[in-house]
Amino acid sequence: MKTYAEQFASWANSLDVKSLDEDLVKNLKFLLKDICGLVISARNEDYVQSLVKTYKNSGNIFVLGHKEKFDLSSSAIISGTSAHGEDYDDTFEGNPMHVGASMISMCLSAGQYFNLSGEQLIKSLVVGGELMCRLALVAPTAMHKQGFHPTAICGTFGVTAGIASVLNLSDKQFASALGIAGSLSSGIIEYLAEGTSTKRLHPGWATSSGMQAAMIAKNNFAGPRTVFEGDHGFFNSFAKKDIDRNFNELTNDLGKVYHVKNLAFKPFACGTMTQPFIDCAIRLKEKIGDISKIKKIKALVGEGTVHRLWEPISEKRNPSSAYSAKFSTPYCIAIGLLKGKAGLAEFDEKNINDQEILKLTQLIEYEIDPDDEYPKNYSGTLVVETEEGQIIEKQACLRGGKKQPLVFKDIDQKFN
């Protein structure tokens, strides 16, 4: 019987781009626009400039927003890091993960290096993006709870599959490439402790590693066929073992159902699960008017979000860096109430030291809601006690997701 890696390889190699439906291709173009805008907008950020100084003039590949040229690996690292750096990039509903940062960076770098056609780039995006989404569905929340960043560790597989699908690897070589990717995957979430920049690096590193895995396998380097389901495979290594796995998610309805079609696009520059609460807060700003009347705010949350976005509560109420603030739901609620928005400018050193914002974060607490549908649905509820009484505000789904999608003009507004 074929392993899951072999089954996926066989499907990917047989995929005919011309058979893809129009909506899927349109969404991928939407993704391209979003990611390219983010790469360019981050070009002068300190963390991007650190990488440019490290790798500049190492090759002949252009990176959007830079005059220097880079080699294949470093161009991918810079693009992927830039795309994800402000946490303004797409996410996947079903288990939060960022697909575009790695997959579009792969297209930008590998497209130049291998002189890929438009059809090849679309195929690589579909194949790699689909594998990332399906990996996220096998054991939702289990990777985060084990201390790993799904964007990073699944991104390596996605890029490997995307490149393998256009470099004419045989099914055997393709499965080996995925096996190799399992050993090149990395990315822990300890950045949460102090809001350091390693999370930003994850998609770039995944892109570089994934391309290497495919290129090595093309020259017949062997990797384990049982990389996903094996006793020492990806899920037994990177996912918390007390959470059930459904490996059939990797292959069920391949070619019929495309999960990559349902990527969500972010209206705010911060962690995915903070966003429904920001929408609630912005509406409450209009309803309450005088924010000083607020006595207490309680957020009803999904249990799986607490360890990343609510605890330790002292850090979340007083973020130690502007980057840490992006993963603090109390901070995000506070800026929604006070600023009425949550773009790039709201996550800077000035705002994280603003005493009015910090005073408000101290009034914000959470309660785990046993009926919360996370990770199947991303919602938010705020219960606010004011001098006049109680107000409840709900956001039933992620704005920008499949139930309430953004349109092209919404993406344009991000970059105006």
Label the model's feature ranges:
Residues 113-125, 168-175, 223-226:
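Structural helix-adjacent loops and short alpha-helical linkers that scaffold large soluble proteins
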Residues 95-101, 122-125, 143-156, 201-205, ...:
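Active-site nucleophile and cofactor-binding loops and adjacent substrate-binding regions
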Residues 102-104, 147-166, 176-249:
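Amphipathic alpha-helical interface segments
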Residues 54, 124-131, 177-184, 300:
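Short acidic/histidine-centered micro-motifs embedded in hydrophobic/aromatic stretches
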Residues 35-42, 99-120, 155-169, 271-289, ...:
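Alpha-helical support elements that line or immediately flank enzyme active sites
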Residues 82-140:
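Hydrophobic alpha-helical hairpins/lids featuring a short glycine-rich hinge
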Residues 1-96, 198-208, 215-416:
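Terminal-appendage/accessory-domain detector
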Residues 59, 131-139, 184-191, 306-308:
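Secretory-pathway/luminal and periplasmic proteins that interact with or process carbohydrate-rich
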